Amino acid sequence: MSQTHDLKTWPVYFDAVKRGEKTFEVRRDDRGFQKGDKLRLLRTREDKPHIVEHGYAIGAGPSHIIDKVITYVLTGGQFGIEPGYVVLGLGDPQ
C-alpha cells in the first residue's frame, strides 16, 4: 500500500521540479520510500525551513504544492550516494 509523504522543498529545487527540469529528489532515507508512494513537495523558505510558504498548515495555494509519484528508488551505499540517502525518480500522478 502506497504512502503519501509531505516534503519541505527549498524554492530553487521546487521551481526546477515545477518547470520539469528536475525529475528526481535526493533525500535522507528515513521514511521507507517505496516505488508508487506519493510525494507532496511543499515550497519552503530557505532562511526559515520550518515555515512553508503561504500557510500550508491552513491550506497553501496550488502554486506552492506539487504532487508527484515515486517511479524509482536508488538506495545509498552505491554509485557515490551516501549510505542512508536515496535518489527518488519523480513522475506525474495518474
Task: Label each residue range with its predicted role.
Residues 2-94:
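Catalytic phosphate/metal-binding cores of nucleic-acid and nucleotide-processing enzymes, i.e., regions
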